[in-house]
Regions:
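Noncatalytic regulatory segments and standalone regulatory/sensor domains
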Residues: 1-88
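Serine endopeptidase catalytic core focused on the charge-relay Asp
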Residues: 60-263, 267, 280-283, 291, ...
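Short, small/polar residue-rich loop motifs at catalytic or cofactor-binding pockets
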Residues: 271-274
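Glycine-rich acetyl-CoA-binding "A-motif" of GNAT/NAT acetyltransferases
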Residues: 286
Length: 315
């Protein structure tokens, strides 16, 4: 697979002897190889070593990745593509599940608008990245409703809808071509943008975050905390926590927005498609779930609230 220079290893530990390192896909006992394939103990008096590296492939975040690993493209079959944030364990069943944003796995639904429902197909890669029905890896299991406001948000209240129908008929009779719609006076607050999906039988999972490593626990958010994330669009980026307990309004479309409280504000460390990324300390401790941002800031939900509301734990 390759060759280079490195310290000879014994029992997986480096020694003080620098030599030629031969990289192989898989180590094989010498007696099972033709003599011409044997690596000599020395080359011109320089010691050699053989290191197993497996199959070397280019990291892909927007293509098909198996086993599933956090940091790659994923999404609801109707939606675009976001990032698989983490592998979590369902506290109810003990089964491993996939964690990302509601707007990634559940199409931004509040549970009543028809955008998504439990059991919907989840694709890896996401539909925007070319994912098809054949790329279905999970089914939507549960989500925290995502409430929005704006011109596209109709009222669910039966009384309001009844008034709307009557007023609409009156206005239409007086002024054909015109109508009446009733909207909520104030949007409900959101604390997290989060959902989990249940993998299909036979779909293998690797909880190791791409280019980051194992998730080692949860860190207490504090201003100035140095963090990193692994996302579908911008890959591995680093940032710093700037604001705690933020209340922010996030655009959901040209005419709708969602109001969030208890948010974490970081320096800019993502772009569209990075939504759902797990934000961690360099030591691998989870801090937040990336949900929104701009070219100047990144907004994330506190991972503790995410896990609590979905009744899951980090795997």
């Amino acid at each position: 697979m390759g060759v280079g220079v490195g310290y000879k290893e014994v029992g997986g530990e480096p020694t003080a002897h620098l030599g030629v390192t031969v990289l192989v896909r898989k180590k094989v006992e010498p007696h099972r190889l033709p003599r011409s394939h044997h690596v000599p103990y020395e080359l011109g008096g320089v010691p050699t070593d053989v290191v197993e590296v497996g199959d070397l492939v280019l990291f892909t975040r927007t293509g098909r990745v198996r086993p599933l690993v956090p940091g790659v493209s994923i999404g609801h079959w109707r939606g675009g593509a976001g990032t698989l944030g983490a592998v979590v364990r369902d506290k109810r069943s003990g089964q491993l599940m996939l964690l990302s944003n509601n707007h990634v796995l559940a199409n931004g639904t509040d549970g009543r608008d028809g955008r998504a429902q439990r059991g919907d197909p989840i694709r890896q890669p996401g539909t925007y990245d070319g994912g098809t029905e054949a790329d279905t890896v999970a089914h939507l299991d549960r989500f925290v409703p995502l409430f929005r406001a704006g011109a596209g948000t109709r009222a669910y209240c039966p009384v309001a809808r009844g008034v709307e129908k009557i007023a609409d008929r009156v206005v239409s009779a007086l002024r054909p071509g015109y109508g009446v719609h009733v909207y909520p006076r104030r949007s409900r607050e959101n604390v997290v943008d989060a959902a989990v999906a249940r993998p299909l039988p036979g779909v293998s999972l690797d909880p190791t975050v791409l280019e980051v490593g194992q998730v080692t626990g949860i860190a207490e958010p504090r201003i100035g905390l140095e963090v990193l994330k692994s996302g579908r669009t911008t890959g591995l980026t680093r940032g710093r926590l700037r604001v705690l307990h933020a209340a922010v309004r996030v655009a959901m479309s040209a005419t709708e927005w969602a109001f969030f409280t208890e948010q974490l504000v970081f320096t800019a460390m993502g772009l569209p498609g990075d939504s759902g990324s797990l934000i961690l300390t360099p030591e691998g401790k989870a801090v937040g779930l990336l949900a929104a941002g701009s070219d100047r800031a990144t907004i994330a939900c506190d991972i503790r609230r995410v896990l609590e509301l979905l009744d899951v734990e980090l795997a």
